[in-house]
């Protein structure tokens, strides 16, 4: 697959690295020689220096024969991204995607208008991240969660604390004990993230302290699993946000709409504070100060908040702020961490949930590199694996025999199936039927092979 990426910023560079590892032919356009030089040290890509809205540059990049064009430059106006995407489509690129920075563009009628113009998808990384944070504040017992088919199935990620009652249990022992405690709960442990590695567990795999368990079940079964693991879901009614970023602005506005009792933003720049105060609803308190100063946080009442969200734009500051918040007794902490090498560090230091803008955006875009049977793709923080939802095509390989007989890739696992209005956990005797929606957990090197089973 030939893919052209416009923009070698954080998201564009991450996409280039990820997609080049998948074996795609990647060309990156940027007007900064420095950014392009940095990218070539970490990814096998062709680079073109120039204006991404130039027809000559787009022709030189090969838009006439490209399968996918991704306009993802955050350093230009969204107009440049939209213009370059439209030009790429006119020049012959099969599908085009553009980054925007205005929520109004994502209103359904506006998205449809751009679709009619030729842009296949618009995405707004900061909006995606803010939605993820809201979800993390709803599910406080998990480090991450994901719904399939509007909640018919749910995947939850649980970090095992040092006092968890399931430590040293094997998968088989856990399954037997959980089934005995709640016979009606169907579930499957589909992966374990341990010390930076992702394991597809076997029956004799034992649970260790700080393991992250990836469990899929019907939504109504998650509370019983949570209780068995020793987790409690805390009702979040007050949130302190450190940093007055664009993400902070969107999160705080959503929280007020959800009628939380208290929402406060701590921002060091007085000009940004004034701007936020003017733009946000009256239910959001904006305080000018340094979120790295623990004395200041105490003065602002950090101990009285149910959750702290750190989105300052500095990974180290976000992680440390969440660690300090936990010491003050805050029940739920969420940190924005853009350096992938710091994600595991943040989790090891006790941060409850980590948001990575590059990862969640990459999942939305990676879907376009697979077959049209993929409904969505999600990268999970703390693991290098991907979660995908497929629709099984008639006559596809996945429908030809029970799962135990189809030689599914070894580093992938089918977690659950949605068939009409019913959902169930997949087992060896399960036979996938045409048009079933299937939840798959896969390591990156197997995704292309998994894709072939559903075509």
Give the predicted meaning of each segment.
Residues 1-455:
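Cytosolic regulatory regions of ion transport systems
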